[in-house]
């Protein structure tokens, strides 16, 4: 159906030319194999009600020689959290300033039932799990590094952690206040709202 063809098109897009460090065509990988068949994955998921897609983009991703071990460990954590083995494929992209991994998960659990992932786990839980693993690999970031990253977020043309904090603090009418925990936080919020 339409969903299966869209999923196949997405996998082809992820494997396009020019996305590896060497500018080559990217290769899908999985739990164990460094090269997996996207067509086989698509066929297994053809009848799934949905598919989960997310991007893991560690802030210090450029410090990883290879993102595969991080992605595999992250997926292991997700399986522990969700209480099921997952059928997934991933691909690493190095064609932007921020190396990142696209992960696609079938919409079935290991018992063949529809896989359910809570919205807040998709929006924050996966990010928190990835950050924990990066801290284990590279060590925790200093306060200065975190502040530097937040200052840069003020000018970003994408949803940032500042935006998420503003949305979380919005009232029922979706009105946000610039007052923050401290002067630095207030400056970040005001700068982002002015953008």
Locate the predicted segments by residue.
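N-terminal nicking endonuclease/strand-transfer module with a His-rich metal-binding environment
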Residues: 1-99, 103-195
